[in-house]
Amino acid sequence: MPVLVTAAHRPIARRIAARLLEEGGEVRAFTDADVASLRAAGAFVASGTWDDVGLLEAALAEVHTVVHVGGGIAETDPSRIVREVEVVASAATGAGVRRLIALSLPGAGPRAEDPIRRAKGEAEEVVAAIPCPTIVVRASLIDTPGIRDVLATAGLSAEQRDIEVAPVRAEDLIELVLALDRVRARATEGHLVVAADGPVRMTIGAYLARVGVGPPGSQALVGRRLPSPERLRALADVLGGPWWTDDPVILDGWRFADRQPAPPGHADAAGG
């Protein structure tokens, strides 16, 4: 059965679609940006803006699973996180989709201290109300070149560099998403929230050193994309965490899906 990945131009979404194609399944990509590489790899690309619920519903015809990544930690308009998932929920319900998997953040909820986690919490509520089986994956800091660039060029203070995170490799998260889809293949109802923390907690400074990003004042900025002031402000809000899940009610996604993540390191080349 087909799988559709929303906002397939986003780095993690694009990589999820590419990995699904490697498994030989029918993959649809919904986006308003260029994803020529996915089209060349065999994906059916439906071009449309994120708020076109009618076009998205049409693209979802006969789709089994929707994977919705949503906005990231440097999203400059947190309200869009909610509006996007509302469109996806409406289209998925109208099309009779059988399962939806969405990414979120540790600590997402209405009383979170930062606007992105509050928006993610509201998005989780929208997902939970969808009539088909749904899965929310609360992923810690996802190690990608984009995240490395943002953190390397953000001018982090010493206090911010000492914040502890539980970074998760992009490739491990992608494999978890695919595994969760398989594990829940027979489910006909229910909402599941799982944690996807990295296996090792470390400071942001230690994480950057581990993935080869030099300290401030070094050559850390050479060849890196500079974030906009708006993205830097959004990042400053979200960095305070939490960056892992301690709630015993929330399942450990790795254990549930029988996966074992590895810590990010110098050998990683996580695309995105």
What are these regions (language model features)?
Residues 29-34, 49-50:
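N-terminal Rossmann-fold cofactor-binding loop
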Residues 2, 174-272:
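Mid/C-terminal beta-alpha module of Rossmann-like enzyme folds, strongest
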Residues 30, 65, 71-72, 77-130, ...:
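Conserved Rossmann-fold NAD(P)-dependent oxidoreductase catalytic core, especially the SDR/UDP-sugar
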Residues 2-25:
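N-terminal Rossmann NAD(P)H-binding glycine-rich loop of SDR-like oxidoreductase domains
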